[in-house]
Amino acid sequence: MKAGIVPVTPLQQNCSLIWCTATNKGALIDPGGDLDKLKAAVERSGVELEKILITHGHMDHCGEAGVLAKELGLPIEGPQEADRFWISRLDEDGARYGMNSQVFEPDRWLEDGDTVTVGNLTLEVIHCPGHAPGHVVFFHRPSKFAVVGDVLFQGSIGRTDFPMGNHQDLIDAITQKLWPLGDDVTFIPGHGPTSTFGQERKTNAFVSDYALS
C-alpha cells in the first residue's frame, strides 16, 4: 500500500490518494474540491482509480465528490448514513461560503465494522462520531495506517461545535476505538501533518493520557 496527500479547497483539506502496489488500483479519500489539481495528481501517479471514499459529509471533504464520481464513472463509498444531514446541505453550504459544493448520494453507506477494498487492499471501517455524526475512519491493519478525517490532528482534535457535534462522543471514539489500534499507527488527518497515535497519546493537549487522567 502507498499513499499521497493533495491539499484541496481554501481550507487545505488533505485529500488522500491511496493505492495497492500489487494491482496499481487506487482510491481518492475526501476529494472535496480542486478537481483539476486532483486529476493531475492521479495522472502523474499512474494509479488507476477504482472508487471514492468519504470520511464525513462536510463540504471541504466531499463538496465535489459527486461531480468527480460522475465525470470519472466511480462509485462513492461512505460515510455512515447519519451524515446524510450534512450531505443534504452541500448546495446550501457551498453557496454560503463561496465554494463549489453539490449534493450527492453515496453508492454505499458504511457502518462500523464494514470493510472496503482498494485493489487487493482491505480497509477496516471505524465509525467515530463527535465531529460529525456519520464520520468514519479507514484503517489498513497490515500497514498500521489510518485516514482519520477530522477526528484527530497532530496536537488537536476535531471541532464539536457544529450541528450534531458532540465532544464526549469524539473523545470516546478516539480513546476507545483508535488508541487500541496501537501507538505505532501512522495517520493522515483531514488537515495538517501526519502523526502517530502514540505521539498524540503523549503530547496532544486534548486526548493525551496525561490530559485525560
Task: Identify the role of each PLM range.
Residues 1-45, 137-149:
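Conserved beta-strand hairpin/beta-sheet module of binuclear metal-dependent hydrolase folds
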Residues 91-93, 115, 121-213:
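Metallo-beta-lactamase
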Residues 2-4, 48, 75, 108, ...:
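Conserved beta-strand segments of alpha/beta enzyme cores
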Residues 6, 18, 112-118:
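Short acidic-hydrophobic surface loop/beta-edge motif
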Residues 6-8, 99, 105-107, 127-129:
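Short Gly/Pro-enriched turn/cap motifs at secondary-structure boundaries
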Residues 28-29, 50-57, 77-80, 127-130, ...:
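Active-site neighborhood of phospho(di)ester-bond hydrolases with catalytic His/Asp-centered motifs
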Residues 33-117, 202-210:
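Active-site HxH/HxHxD metal-binding segment of metal-dependent hydrolases
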Residues 22-23, 33, 59, 83, ...:
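Short, glycine/acidic-enriched loop or turn micro-motifs at the edges of active sites
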